[in-house]
């Protein structure tokens, strides 16, 4: 039995060895050895190749004997898109399902290192492995991969180039002293070309208009029989419709708090006697109960706030194709709301804002009137600056800045604006391109004129729906909050319709009540501090008038009051020493007020007094009665990096996140609903102001304004 078992093992081993030898010798050629090496190694530079990108129509026009500039804008636009339409195999592969950007393609050394390691592992048991030049094989493969990525980039470059011209021709009525004039959309060829290229350039658009509900009646979209182009329908539906307010319902907020916050905002609008009509936009179904709740708040009789609000609900879901509905984000809701609103000029308010002035005043800004946009800057928190970069981060930022913006041919043929350092918006935008900041925009309040910004809004839509998870995701979404508000200004930047993108000159500020000096950071003597979950914005006309604040502090108070109150108590109570009567000592000489020491000197201290430690709760009591009390405003310094304090015990940055408050809404803390909002402390000076530090500004709020703000905050807090 043992002999048979031993023989079985020997035979099995021989057969297995023979099988392995046979398998190695007779493998298919493609599996036995790598592809043959091309003796002439192709050297391909992905970044330098971008300098050769060219719009194909411009390339033809440059060689043409007749200049397109000799014709009017309508003829020139028709010629451009007619040539593009007849171009052989014209197609925008905007989202090739078979292609995905490999970020390491932008890091040649790392790509080659990993590929060589992989090849050596793959052919570890190949008897001819010593004959293979894995270095050369990897370089040849990298050249192929780089070329494929370059083709992908070229396709994106041409897509944005064509959309920019489309926007100039069909999606703007902004002359702005532009001597090219405005296209005649009554031209049948223009109408047909517009219709054809909407489907090619903006495939996320379904071709349908939103559904409006006014006075509890749904109204079908109003279509103009004179045009078949959805872009022209959008423009005509809002032309001459005046000004209004848009309040978007964010899809990522699934809590009922959103409806409550919007209801409170509408109450504040009534308190401000707002007369602008309101559109509440949404993508997902809003319940009839929520609609009724908001409708009642807006239109119910009130002796205290008699100005009823004109409110409509706008269902945006018909406007996009089913393929992109899964990629709806907060910023894309704002984009869609701006494109499909019935207003020509509009203010977008998010659920967290408390306006402090009449909203019609925002439209009076002269820079807005000229350029059609007005953004407020988000708080200049250093956490918005990227310090850990995705692979390809800088290469994609360079691609956006140098390839996607209007070039000299866009300027020459269509008088689109090139961006340069002489433009006022560049100082702000440099924070994105040169200092790696994200979230430049405070989404609390945004102002658009559709006739001047529709082209850029359509480009923002392409960013959102076509490239949201590929190339630009490497740069745009490299942020902890994963928000994409930068697409809103980038669309305007790339469109070239307006010479400037208008930002408020000031960055966000912190309104509130000063932290008592006893509770300031250790050894801080120069700075003032205000701590809150809310921020605000100042007018850039006088730099001191408060325009609006956010309600985050009040939401924390309402939704997590017990826990939030305990944290605020720790923050604002402070100890002080007080002289009190010492009842344990009986002094028979009540007329003696001084004592003489052994040296014959008198002591001023009364021996009948004791130093007693006290706790001062006066500031905390103010906050309990008014959770967002505005006595002072701090306009902190704007930084691009922390200040090296060099042993000087002052803050090294302007906005300091308070980690203790992050527990709000977690683990049942506060017995509230939903997640709490972050809590920050803001400082009026950073470092040593006499040396390397920077000083900001503190503003005392006058009593009359304090009363006004208190009234509006109380309106917001009302149930």
Curated annotation (Swiss-Prot):
Cellular compartments per GO CC: Golgi apparatus; Golgi membrane
Entry EC no(s): 2.4.1.-
Regions of this protein lying in the Cytoplasmic compartment: 1-4
Group of enzyme by EC: transferase
Glycosylation sites: 148, 273, 449
Subcellular localization, as worded in the UniProt entry: Golgi apparatus membrane
Pathways involved: Protein modification; protein glycosylation
Major subcellular site: Golgi
GO molecular function: alpha-1,3-mannosyltransferase activity
Top-level division of the source organism's lineage: Eukaryota
Pfam families listed in its UniProt record: Mannosyl_trans3
Induction annotation: induced in low iron conditions.
One Gene Ontology biological process: protein O-linked glycosylation
Keywords noted in UniProt: Glycoprotein, Glycosyltransferase, Golgi apparatus, Membrane, Signal-anchor, Transferase, Transmembrane, Transmembrane helix
Transmembrane segments: 5-22
Membrane topology, Lumenal segments: 23-719
Membrane topology value: Single-pass type II membrane protein
Role summary: Responsible for addition of the terminal mannose residues to the outer chain of core N-linked polysaccharides and to O-linked mannotriose. Implicated in late Golgi modifications.
Family to which this protein belongs: Belongs to the MNN1/MNT family.
Name used for this protein in its record: Putative alpha-1,3-mannosyltransferase MNT4
Natural source organism: Candida albicans (strain SC5314 / ATCC MYA-2876) (Yeast)
Lineage: Eukaryota, Fungi, Dikarya, Ascomycota, Saccharomycotina
Gene from which the chain derives: MNT4
